[in-house]
């Protein structure tokens, strides 16, 4: 299987970071791109084996684009700290990367929740984002 880095952008995510990292522990590298958190985010991430890099936050895309070239692996999986990679998604990603692919990027369908309940209407039920891609090809 081709190697993959999971990148998790953070700022004061101590409530979420442990579960986010646990959901991508299967990745070859977990890279936390932190915006100088003032809580225990960095401490928790390092204690769980993540590599932490830091810079001041500009905006979401700039933070992610700054982190992407620092990934050690040719494939990148972006995960926000309040998101989780399900075992089903993990299996699908591993399947794609173990077979080889001509594609440079993949859409990931998301299941969104609001106040603890799944959103099944209003357009959010079909939400998808590009979160799995080749490091040197996409931004």
Where does each model-flagged region fall?
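Cell-envelope/extracellular polymer assembly enzymes that use nucleotide-activated donors
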Residues: 3-5
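Short, well-formed alpha-helical segments that are part of the catalytic scaffolds
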Residues: 7-26
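Acidic helix N-cap motif at the loop->helix transition within catalytic regions
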Residues: 18, 39-48, 88-89
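A conserved acidic beta->alpha catalytic loop
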Residues: 23, 34-46, 80
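Conserved donor nucleotide-binding strand/loop of the catalytic core
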Residues: 42-72
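Catalytic-site signature of metal-activated, phosphate-bearing donor transferases
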Residues: 62-68, 74-79, 86-139
């Amino acid at each position: 299987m081709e190697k993959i880095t999971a990148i998790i952008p953070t700022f004061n995510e101590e409530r979420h970071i442990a579960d986010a990292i646990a959901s991508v522990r299967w990745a070859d590298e977990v890279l936390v791109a932190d915006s100088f958190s003032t809580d225990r985010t960095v401490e928790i991430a390092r204690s769980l084996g993540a590599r932490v890099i830091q810079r001041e936050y500009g905006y979401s895309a700039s933070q992610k684009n700054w982190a992407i070239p620092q990934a050690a692996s040719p494939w990148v999986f972006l995960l926000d700290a309040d998101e989780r990679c399900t075992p089903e998604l993990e299996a699908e990603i591993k399947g794609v990367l173990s077979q080889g692919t001509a594609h440079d990027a993949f859409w990931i369908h998301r299941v969104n929740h609001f106040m603890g309940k799944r959103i099944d209407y209003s357009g959010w039920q079909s939400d998808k984002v590009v979160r799995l891609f080749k490091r040197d090809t996409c931004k």
